[in-house]
């Protein structure tokens, strides 16, 4: 945080765009910054609830809270503490890696890369959402505020549930996973299961074949990207978000009577890996 405040941030947009930004105001305590109009959460899903509690000193009676974190269940964590009319959810399609303090490499997809919207519509969430959309757009990020965020949120959950555990288990980038017929088949099986669960819930989402065709294009846009779960499993040895991805799809599948055998198995494998980092050979 001190490095960013004093020297700014160096951004590399893969493969060869470079930017330097100054003027960041940073703090390690929400108690030091006053009451905010909006608070955006961009933690790991496993860290969100602690982050919500830690942010309490800067959250006033009109503050809008926005989770841009991948995975199912982030809305429930917000609603545990704040009313739906002040809460928004969303997600992005921008893979990132922090190479060093103040240095970030991103692997964005083409088109819209950030989507967000209200859990329950209110004039305040609409006003904040449209302002946030403008800030993103002015900064060069193609972002869209949407009244109905669920189709896009589920699309990202299914995509991450496909890419994250499969590539982590195979220890491959998304491009190398996609290029291998067996890896691609595993991606596709999760997508088909996730789409079936979403449709059973009444989510207006594209058909599985269309989803897979679109996913193949995105894998080839950023083939070198190593997703965060693969980083956690292979390099950092950290707890993963598996329970909010394939684990959550499996749970929803049981509720709605949709079989999810691939999601079930991937959840077990990643859970076993992260439970035994210190014993691996």
Located regions from the model:
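Short, hinge-like loop/turn segments at secondary-structure boundaries
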Residues: 9-14, 83-84, 104-108, 161-163, ...
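Helix-loop-beta segment of a Rossmann-like dinucleotide-binding subdomain
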Residues: 59, 103-118, 168-178, 226-234
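NAD(P)-dependent Rossmann-like dehydrogenase/reductase catalytic/cofactor-binding core
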Residues: 184-281
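Rossmann-like NAD(P)(H) cofactor-binding subdomain of soluble oxidoreductases
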Residues: 18-104
């Amino acid at each position: 945080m001190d490095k960013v405040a004093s020297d700014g941030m160096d951004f590399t947009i893969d493969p060869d765009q470079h930017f330097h930004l100054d003027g960041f105001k940073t703090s390690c305590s929400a108690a030091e910054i006053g009451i905010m109009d909006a608070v955006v959460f961009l933690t790991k899903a496993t860290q969100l609830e602690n982050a919500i509690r830690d942010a309490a000193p800067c959250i006033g009676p009109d503050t809008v809270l926005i989770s841009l974190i991948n995975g199912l269940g982030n809305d429930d964590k917000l609603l545990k503490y704040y009313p739906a009319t002040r809460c928004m959810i969303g997600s992005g399609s921008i893979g990132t890696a922090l190479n060093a303090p103040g240095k970030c490499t991103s692997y964005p997809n083409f088109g819209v890369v950030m989507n967000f919207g209200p859990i329950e519509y209110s004039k305040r969430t609409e006003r904040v959402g449209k302002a946030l959309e403008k800030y993103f757009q002015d900064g060069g990020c193609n972002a869209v505020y949407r009244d109905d965020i669920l189709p896009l949120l589920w699309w990202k959950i299914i995509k991450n549930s496909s890419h994250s555990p499969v590539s982590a288990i195979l220890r491959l980038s998304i491009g190398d996973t996609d290029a291998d017929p067996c890896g691609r088949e595993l991606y596709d099986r999760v997508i088909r299961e996730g789409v079936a669960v979403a449709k059973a819930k009444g989510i207006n989402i594209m058909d599985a074949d269309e989803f897979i065709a679109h996913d193949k294009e995105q894998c080839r846009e950023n083939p070198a990207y190593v997703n965060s779960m693969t980083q956690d499993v292979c390099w950092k040895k950290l707890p993963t978000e598996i329970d909010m991805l394939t684990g959550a799809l499996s749970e929803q599948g049981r509720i709605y009577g949709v079989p999810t055998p691939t999601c079930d198995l991937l959840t077990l494998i990643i859970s076993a890996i992260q439970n035994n980092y210190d014993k691996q050979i």
